[in-house]
Regions:
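Interhelical loop and adjacent transmembrane-helix boundary motif
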Residues: 1-4, 163-202, 206
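Transmembrane alpha-helix signature in integral membrane proteins
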Residues: 2-33, 49
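Transmembrane alpha-helices
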Residues: 18, 101-104, 108, 112, ...
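Cytoplasmic-entry segments and transmembrane alpha-helices of multi-pass inner-membrane transporters
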Residues: 27-62, 116
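Membrane-helix interface segments
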Residues: 34-41, 69, 84, 114, ...
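C-terminal transmembrane helix and the adjacent membrane-cytosol boundary/short C-terminal tail
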Residues: 37, 41, 98, 105-116, ...
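Membrane-interfacial helix termini and adjacent extracytoplasmic/periplasmic loops
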Residues: 57-93, 164-167
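Non-cytoplasmic
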Residues: 65-66, 142-180
């Protein structure tokens, strides 16, 4: 049993969660503070959550493919994207970012606005208000978003196989390894990878739930 799909999955989910964390909380804060087109912005950010992952992967191919202007620009800089590990990260970010965004936005909306008003009257900058007041006070919701984001990225399949492919040792994650094993009629290998993915997800979620319960007590 080759272990590269496990490490590729772990690296991809970790990188995607890291990127989605900063993008998600920044977008949540920005959307809450725009007056015009807030509904449109919210819909665009949330859209990948409701679209079939294969559709997301197809549009990623259109945007970053070799024949697209953006894809060609990356190629000119010597940075190919399609069917590389970077593509697995991009696919995971696109499908998991809405979860981070929605939970972070919900956490920010529940905060007492008087705290922010008081900080502003004291002359505290918006940057410090965001990182020193809003994020720490919304930490439980943000951590919940991180858990959802990581587990979503961990099990990503449709967008990944469309945009990054299923290249062993490069883009083959546990999910795509299961698909490849079933296609090869190797159900024993598929079962091993499926069990590993379930167990890893359970351990991660249980550990994060225990940490959240301890931090609230």
């Amino acid at each position: 049993m080759e272990f590269s799909p496990f490490w590729i999955t772990l690296k991809t989910a970790t990188a995607a969660t890291f990127i989605s964390f900063f993008l998600g909380i920044a977008l949540a804060y920005a959307v809450l503070h725009i007056r015009r087109f807030q509904g449109i912005a919210d819909a665009v950010i949330t859209l990948p959550m409701v679209l079939p992952p294969t559709v997301v992967g197809f549009f990623l191919l259109l945007v970053f493919g070799r024949k697209s202007p953006l894809g060609q620009m990356f190629l000119d800089f010597g940075v190919p994207l399609v069917f590389t590990w970077k593509a697995t990260v991009i696919a995971a970010v696109v499908v998991s970012l809405p979860l981070m965004y929605r939970t972070a936005r919900g956490a920010f909306e529940q905060l007492d606005k008087n705290i922010v008003y008081a900080a502003r009257t004291l002359g505290i900058s918006e940057w410090r208000i965001f990182w020193r007041i809003l994020v720490p006070n919304a930490r439980h919701g943000i951590v919940a978003g991180l858990v959802l984001t990581f587990t979503r990225a961990l099990g990503e399949f449709g967008a990944t196989i469309m945009f990054a492919g299923n290249v062993p040792g490069t883009t083959q994650t546990m999910s795509t390894a299961i698909y490849a094993a079933v296609q090869a009629n190797d159900y024993d290998l598929a079962f091993q990878w499926a069990t590993a993915l379930v167990l890893f997800s359970l351990v991660f979620v249980a550990a994060m739930n225990a940490w959240l319960a301890r931090s609230r007590s």
